[in-house]
UniProtKB/Swiss-Prot annotation:
This is Retrotransposable element SLACS 132 kDa protein. It comes from the Eukaryota. Residues 420-446 have a biased composition (Basic and acidic residues). Residues 77-97, 163-220, 317-339, 418-478 are annotated as: Disordered. Residues 163-174 have a biased composition (Acidic residues). It catalyses: DNA(n) + a 2'-deoxyribonucleoside 5'-triphosphate = DNA(n+1) + diphosphate. InterPro entries: DNA/RNA_pol_sf (IPR043502), RT_dom (IPR000477). Its EC number is 2.7.7.49. Pfam families: RVT_1. Residues 456-475 have a biased composition (Polar residues).
C-alpha cells in the first residue's frame, strides 16, 4: 500500500498493489500509517461568475483539505449544518462559469423510485451519457429537467502548467520540501525513472522504450472515464422464476440463451415479468418470445428476422402505408418514440405522489364528442388511430405508458363537436396563459433563491430581520419531493387490502377474442366515459389486422395493471348520471370507460366457468340464470311453506369494498382478476357530476362497486358469497336463494322470523341495510311471526300467496304483459322509417314476452300470447299498408335464414317455453324443430315460381335488408321488399298494362313493359357499382367494346395498380328458371338450390365473355344477383380478389361490405320502378 507523498497536499488517493490471488486486508492501523487527514472550516466555498453556493460538511467526519485536487459534492433538498441548501439555477451545465470548477457527474431521479447517473462527455459539449442499469444512452442537455437532479458532483480543474511546476519544484528544493510528481505525469516507482512517454490515461506512446516490452508493468493513476472502463464480468442469472442457474465469462449471454431455450418452455419465457427482464438488461419480443439485449441495434436486427415472409405486393402496400403514415399526424408518434426508458413498473397503489385531479383538463370538463362514425369516415379515423397504436406492442414500458395517455385523448382531441371545439379552444388559451404565469413565477423564485442564502452565510448563518418571510417561502421543498402522508387519497387507500405478494402469471389476450368481445359483448349505443370512447368508435379498429393486434396489447396491459398512474386514475374516474326510479327515488349510474369495460369482459371470461361452480345453488345473478332461480324459489316455497324476499338499500354502492377485496384476494380462483381489480378498486376513484360539460361537484368513491361497472355484479356476488354460505350452514332448515342483491329466504313459518333477522344482521355487517319497503313475506299456512309487534326491529309487508290455480296469477301475468302495449303504440305513432319500426318490433318487443312465457305455466300465458300475436300482426299491417293473409303471417313467423322475417308466433312458443326453463338449449332445439315443420308445410303448399322465390329467400344475403343497417331503404322500397317475401306485391285482381294478371312472375319476366324499367334498374346498379370501386382507387370504364365490329359490351372495365378486371352485371328473377331445377320433385327446402337461377345466368355470361377476357389478360367473372338482393358466391369471391389487389385506405372487408350494401339497395330501388311501370296510371306504390 502506498499513500500520498505529501500529506500537506493530500490527493485523497490510496494505491493498492496486491500480488496475484492475494487477499486484501485494510484495517484502521494500516490506514493510519499511510493516510492522514486534516480538519478544515465548516464551510467550503465554490465561487463562479458572481454566484455563491455553499456546501456544509457533516460535523461527524473530517473533510479533506480542498486546496488540492478533490471533488466537491452538492446535494439538493438536504439539510446540512442546520440550514437547507439550494442548487444553482442550472446544475447540469457541462462546465461551471468559473474556470477552476468542472461538473463531473450528476444523479437524476426521473421518478421518485428510480435514479440514473449522468456523466458529461469530454469531446462533445452539452451531451450527457445516461447510465441506467446496464443501459447506456447519450442525450442532449436540453432533454434533462433540472428539477429532477438530486445531486451534482464537481471537481476542481488543474490550472498548473509545466513551467509553473518547474518553478514550484525549485522553490520546494530551497525549502527542503519533497516535491511530488505531477498527477498527469506520475507513474509507479517500480517503473523507469526517465520520461516514459505515457499519456494522461496511462497508455504508452509511439517510440517509447516500453513499447516493445510487454512484460513491463506500470501502475499508472489515470483519470476515471466511463468510456474506458470495461464492464465487470458479473454472473448472469437465469430470469425464469425458480431457476438458480447462473453464467459467467465473456460469452455468458450466449450460454444463458442456450439454457433458456433448451431447458425451459416458451410459456415460461412469456410469463417473465417485463420489469424483471429490464432490470437484467433484457427485453422480450412479444411476437415470438425471443430474449435479446436492450439495445436499439439488437432490436432492429431482431425485427428484420421476426417478420414473416410477405409477398411483393404486400410489401409494396405496407411501404406505402408507412410513407402515408409518416406524412400524416406523425408528430405525436415521433415524440413517443424518443421517450426515455423507465425502470421496472410499480403499481399505482405503491406510488406516493400528490395528485390534484381537479386541475387536469380531462377531469375539469366533459367534452361533447361523436359517439359513432359513418362507414365513409372510418378511413380517416383509422389513420388517426394508427399514429398512436402502431408500434405499441414493440415499445418499451415508458413508451407504452405515454401512448396510453395519448390513446385516451384521441376522441377528445379529434372527434369533439363544433361547439365543444370552440369552447375547448377558448379554455386552452386560458390554460396556456396560466401555465406561462406559473412558469414565470417559478423562474423568478429560482433566480432569487440564492440571494437570501448568501446573505445569511455572510452574517454567520443567521438571516437578517428583514428576511424571515422570504426565507419561509423559499425554504419549502420542491413539489415532487413533498410526501402525501396527509393526502386523502393516501389515507383512504391504506384501508384497502392489496393483492398477494406472489402474483399469478401474466393474463394473455388473443386478438381474435378481443375483436369478438367488441362486436358481441360491448353494449351498442352505451354512454361513453370521460375519454369519449364508445363501442362504435372501437369496432372499426378491429377490421384492420395491425390495429387489432395493438388493441389486444393495450387490453393486456390494462388487465395486468401495466399502466401509468394517470391512466389508472382516468380508468377509475366516472361521470355520474342520475336516473329517476318509478317510486320517485334516484339511481346513480357511473359511465365506465369502454377500455375498462373491454378489459373486464376479457377478465370475466377467464373465471366464468369457475364462477358458476362457486355460485352453484345459492347465487344465480352471475351468468343470467334467472329461470333456475325462480324454479328453485317455487320449489323451496312449496316445501318450506313460507318465504321472505329481502332487498338491500343501495346495495351496490353500500357494500364494504374492503370485504370485496379480501374475498377476491383470499381465493386463488379469482387470480386472473387481481391486477385489474386492484387497478379499478384498489384506490379511491373520482366521481364527478357535470352540467353542460362543466364539473359541478365531485365525490370520492370509497365503498362498494359503481352501478354501470362491468365487474360490478361479479364482485358483488363474490363479496356476499361467504356470508350466504355461512348462513346456510347456520340454518340448515332454511334455503337461501340470491340474485345479486335480492335474497330470498325459505323456511318453516315458525323459523322464518329468526332466519330473516340473522340474514339482515349479516348483511348489515357488510354494509348493506335491508329495505323494509321492498320486503315481502309469503306463506301458505301458519303464522310467520311478522306483525306490528316487531315494528321496532324491521317492518315487513305481509300478504298471502294465492292458489297456483287461481285467476289472480293469470291476471298478474296479463297486467305485466299489457305494459308492452306502450311500445306498440310508440312504433305506430312516432315518425320513424318503416325499416326502423320493423327492427324495433323484432328486436325489442319479442324478448319482453318471452320472459313471461318461460317463467309461468301455459294456462296462465296462453291468453297473453294470443293477444301479443294479434297486436304484432296489426303493427306489421300498418308497416305494409295492407292486410296480411294467413300464409303471409306464417312466412313472417319463420326466421330470416329460413325465408321468413323473424316475427314468431308467441302462442306456439308458450306451449313448450315453461317446460324448458332450467334446461340449457332445450327451448332452442324445440323452436328449431317447430320452424322446420312450418317451413316444410309452406313449401308443400307452394308451387311453380312461388316455390322458387320462397326457396331463393333462404339464400345467403337474401335477408340482409332486414338485418344489416348498411342497406338503407326508403319506405316504398322496404314495403316492396317485404311484400315480395310474402309472395305477392300488388293486390289480388290488379292487372298489368298489357292486360295480364300483375303477379310477381309476370312483372319480372314480361316483355311488354313500357319505358324499359329493368334496363333502368340495370343502369342504376352499374353506376353504383362503379362509384364504389372508384372510392377504392380504381379507374372504371363502362361498356367497353370487345372489338371494332362486335356489338357485345361488358358492363365495367376495372383498372388498378396491379389489377385489370372486367365484369358484366346481371339481375335475374328466381322464378325465371322452372325446368330442371329444385322446384320439380323436391319435398323440402333443404334439398333445393336457392341460387339455381343465378347459376344459370352466371354460366351464360361466362360463356359469352370469358374467352375474350383471357385473350386480353383480364380477370373476368359475371356479377350475378337475384331480385331479392342475394349475390352469387363466385361473384362475391371475384369482388374480394379485385379489392385485395388494390392498395386503398379501406380494408377489404369494409370496402366489400360498403359496395355490396349499396348495390343491394340499388337493386331493391330498381324493383320499385319495375312494379310502378307495370301498374295502371294514377296508382303509385306505397
Amino acid at each position: 500500500m502506498e499513500g500520498p507523498s505529501n500529506p500537506g497536499e493530500n490527493l485523497g488517493i490510496i494505491s493498492v498493489n496486491p500480488n496475484t490471488c492475494e487477499s486484501i486486508e485494510l484495517t484502521n492501523q494500516i490506514l493510519a500509517k499511510t493516510y492522514t487527514t486534516s480538519w478544515t472550516d465548516m464551510e467550503v466555498y465554490a465561487r463562479g461568475n458572481g454566484r455563491i453556493c455553499t456546501a456544509y460538511p457533516d460535523v461527524d467526519h473530517p473533510l479533506q483539505d480542498v486546496r488540492g485536487n478533490v471533488s466537491s459534492i452538492l446535494e439538493r433538498g438536504e439539510r446540512s449544518g442546520g440550514f437547507e441548501t439550494h442548487p444553482p439555477r442550472d446544475p447540469v451545465t457541462p462546465r461551471e462559469r468559473h474556470g477552476n470548477i468542472q461538473t463531473r457527474g450528476a444523479v437524476i431521479a426521473p421518478t421518485p423510485f428510480h435514479v440514473v447517473a449522468a456523466i458529461p462527455q469530454q469531446t462533445r459539449k452539452r451531451r450527457w451519457d445516461i447510465l441506467d442499469g446496464m443501459v447506456r444512452r447519450t442525450v442532449s442537455q436540453s432533454t434533462v429537467d433540472p428539477k429532477t437532479v438530486v445531486m451534482c458532483v464537481y471537481r476542481r480543474e488543474e490550472e498548473e502548467t509545466y513551467d509553473v511546476l518547474d518553478e514550484e519544484e525549485q522553490d520546494d528544493d530551497l525549502l527542503g520540501i519533497p516535491n511530488p510528481t505531477p498527477r498527469r505525469l506520475r507513474i509507479s516507482q517500480a517503473g523507469p525513472q526517465q520520461n516514459s512517454w505515457v499519456d494522461t490515461r496511462g497508455r504508452r506512446a509511439y517510440g517509447s522504450q516500453e513499447e516493445q516490452d510487454e512484460r513491463t508493468s506500470t501502475d499508472q493513476v489515470s483519470i476515471f472515464s466511463h468510456d474506458e472502463t470495461r464492464e465487470l464480468s458479473s454472473p448472469l442469472e437465469c430470469p425464469i422464476v425458480g431457476c438458480t442457474a447462473s453464467f459467467v465469462g465473456p460469452r455468458r449471454w450466449e450460454k444463458a440463451k442456450s439454457h433458456i431455450y433448451g431447458v425451459h418452455s416458451l410459456e415460461e419465457v412469456r410469463e417473465i415479468p417485463r420489469g424483471e427482464l429490464i432490470c437484467k438488461g433484457i427485453v422480450r419480443c412479444e411476437t415470438c418470445a425471443t430474449l435479446l439485449p436492450t439495445s436499439d441495434r439488437a432490436k432492429q436486427a431482431h425485427r428484420d428476422d421476426c417478420r414473416p415472409y410477405l409477398p411483393r405486393k404486400e410489401n409494396i402496400r405496407r411501404k406505402r402505408a408507412a410513407e402515408r403514415e409518416a406524412t400524416e399526424a406523425s408528430a405525436q408518434q415521433g415524440i413517443a418514440l424518443r421517450l426515455e426508458r423507465q425502470g421496472p413498473y410499480i403499481t399505482p397503489r405503491d406510488i406516493e405522489e400528490p395528485t390534484n385531479t381537479t386541475t387536469e383538463s380531462w377531469w375539469r370538463e366533459k367534452v361533447a364528442t361523436k359517439r359513432y362514425l359513418h362507414r365513409k369516415e372510418w378511413p380517416q379515423w383509422l389513420d388517426i388511430c394508427r399514429t398512436v397504436l402502431l408500434g405499441y406492442s414493440a415499445s418499451s414500458q415508458g413508451e407504452r405508458h405515454q401512448r396510453q395517455v395519448m390513446l385516451l385523448d384521441l376522441v377528445r382531441n379529434h372527434l369533439h363537436t363544433r361547439t365543444a371545439r370552440r369552447e375547448q379552444q377558448q379554455q386552452r388559451g386560458k390554460d396556456n396563459q396560466e401555465e406561462e404565469d406559473r412558469q414565470k413565477k417559478e423562474e423568478k423564485s429560482l433566480r432569487n433563491a440564492w440571494k437570501p442564502c448568501a446573505s445569511s452565510v455572510r452574517q454567520g448563518g443567521q438571516p437578517s430581520s428583514s428576511q424571515p418571510k422570504r426565507l419561509n417561502r423559499w425554504s419549502t421543498a420542491p413539489k415532487w419531493l413533498k410526501q402525501s402522508g396527509n393526502c386523502t387519497r393516501r389515507r383512504i387507500s391504506m384501508i384497502f387490502p392489496g393483492p398477494p405478494v406472489e402474483q399469478p402469471g401474466v393474463v394473455s389476450v388473443d386478438a381474435e377474442e378481443v375483436a369478438k368481445t367488441i362486436a358481441r359483448r360491448l353494449t351498442r349505443g352505451a354512454a361513453p366515459g370521460l375519454d369519449g370512447w364508445t363501442r362504435e368508435l372501437l369496432y372499426p379498429l378491429t377490421l384492420d389486422p395491425a390495429l387489432k393486434m395493438e388493441i389486444a396489447a393495450v387490453v393486456k396491459d390494462i388487465i395486468n395493471a401495466d399502466v401509468s398512474m394517470e391512466v389508472g386514475r382516468r380508468l377509475q374516474a366516472t361521470s355520474l348520471t342520475v336516473l329517476r326510479k318509478p317510486n320517485g327515488k334516484y339511481r346513480p349510474i357511473g359511465a365506465e370507460s369502454v377500455w375498462a369495460k373491454l378489459a373486464s369482459h376479457i377478465a370475466i371470461s377467464r373465471v366464468m366457468k369457475t364462477a358458476e361452480k362457486k355460485f352453484s345453488g345459492i347465487q344465480f345473478g352471475v351468468g343470467g340464470h334467472i329461470e333456475e332461480a325462480i324454479a328453485k324459489i317455487r320449489k323451496d316455497f312449496a316445501t318450506k311453506g313460507s318465504l321472505a324476499m329481502l332487498d338491500g338499500r343501495n346495495a351496490y354502492n353500500a357494500i364494504s369494498r374492503r370485504a370485496i377485496l379480501e374475498a377476491v384476494y383470499g381465493d386463488s380462483t379469482w387470480s386472473p382478476l387481481w391486477r385489474l381489480v386492484s387497478l379499478l378498486l384498489g384506490t379511491t376513484g373520482e366521481v364527478g357530476f357535470y352540467e353542460n360539460g362543466k364539473l359541478c361537484h365531485t365525490w370520492e368513491s370509497t365503498r362498494g362497486v359503481r352501478q354501470g361497472m362491468v365487474l360490478g355484479p361479479l364482485l358483488f356476488s363474490i363479496g356476499t358469497l361467504a356470508t350466504l354460505r355461512r348462513l346456510q350452514q347456520t340454518f340448515p332448515e332454511a334455503q337461501f336463494t340470491a340474485y345479486l342483491d335480492d335474497v330470498t329466504v325459505a323456511a318453516p313459518p315458525e323459523e322464518l322470523k329468526n332466519v330473516c333477522a340473522a340474514t339482515a344482521e349479516a348483511m348489515e355487517a357488510l354494509g348493506i341495510v335491508n329495505n323494509a319497503d321492498k320486503t315481502e313475506v309469503l306463506e301458505l299456512t301458519g303464522d310467520t311471526g311478522f306483525g306490528t309487534a316487531v315494528k321496532r326491529v324491521r317492518e315487513f309487508l305481509e300478504r298471502t300467496w294465492p292458489d297456483p290455480m287461481s285467476e289472480e296469477i293469470r291476471e298478474g301475468v296479463e297486467k305485466k304483459a299489457m305494459e308492452t302495449d306502450r311500445l306498440f303504440k310508440a312504433i305506430v305513432e312516432l315518425p320513424l322509417y318503416n325499416r326502423t319500426r320493423w327492427r324495433i318490433l323484432a328486436m325489442s318487443a319479442m324478448p319482453r314476452i318471452t320472459f313471461l312465457l318461460r317463467n309461468h305455466d301455459m294456462q296462465h300465458t296462453h291468453r297473453v300470447a294470443s293477444w301479443f300475436d294479434e297486436r304484432t300482426t296489426q303493427v306489421m299491417e300498418h308497416i305494409l299498408g295492407q292486410p296480411m293473409t294467413e300464409r303471409a303471417r306464417n312466412i313472417a313467423a319463420l326466421p330470416v335464414s329460413m325465408g321468413g322475417c323473424g316475427i314468431r308466433r308467441m302462442a306456439q312458443v308458450a306451449e313448450y317455453a315453461h317446460q324448458c326453463a332450467g334446461e340449457k338449449g332445450l327451448q332452442q332445439r324445440k323452436t328449431e324443430e317447430a320452424d322446420q315443420r312450418q317451413q316444410d308445410d309452406l313449401y308443400a303448399t307452394l308451387g311453380g315460381a312461388d316455390r322458387q322465390v320462397f326457396t331463393a329467400n333462404t339464400a345467403a344475403g337474401a335477408g340482409r335488408p332486414l338485418t344489416d343497417a348498411q342497406v338503407r331503404l326508403d319506405d316504398a322500397t322496404f314495403g316492396v321488399y317485404l311484400r315480395e317475401r310474402y309472395c305477392r306485391v300488388l293486390p289480388e285482381g290488379v292487372k298489368c298494362l298489357c292486360g295480364e294478371d300483375a303477379s310477381n312472375h309476370h312483372i319480372h319476366t314480361g316483355t311488354k313493359v313500357h319505358n324499359k324499367p329493368r334496363q333502368m334498374r340495370h343502369d342504376i346498379i352499374n353506376s353504383v357499382f362503379a362509384n364504389g370501386l372508384r372510392l377504392c382507387g380504381f379507374q372504371c370504364a363502362t361498356e367497353p367494346r370487345l372489338n371494332e365490329v362486335s356489338k357485345r359490351r361488358p358492363d365495367i372495365l376495372i383498372a388498378g395498380l396491379d389489377t385489370y378486371a372486367v365484369t358484366d352485371i346481371t339481375v335475374t328473377y328466381p322464378g325465371r328458371v322452372t325446368v330442371g331445377n329444385t322446384a320439380q320433385g323436391q319435398r323440402s327446402v333443404a334439398a333445393a338450390d336457392p341460387m339455381k337461377a343465378a347459376l344459370v345466368a352466371f354460366q351464360e355470361k361466362e360463356r359469352k365473355y370469358s374467352y375474350w377476357a383471357i385473350q386480353n389478360g383480364l380477370a373476368f367473372a359475371p356479377f350475378v344477383m337475384l331480385t331479392n338482393g342475394a349475390i352469387f358466391g363466385k361473384s362475391r369471391d371475384w369482388l374480394r380478389r379485385v379489392l385485395r389487389g388494390q392498395d386503398h385506405r379501406l380494408t377489404v372487408t369494409t370496402a366489400f361490405d360498403g359496395i355490396t350494401a349499396d348495390v343491394v339497395a340499388a337493386v331493391l330501388r330498381g324493383n320499385v320502378h319495375v312494379y310502378s311501370a307495370a301498374q295502371a296510371r294514377g296508382e303509385t306504390l306505397r
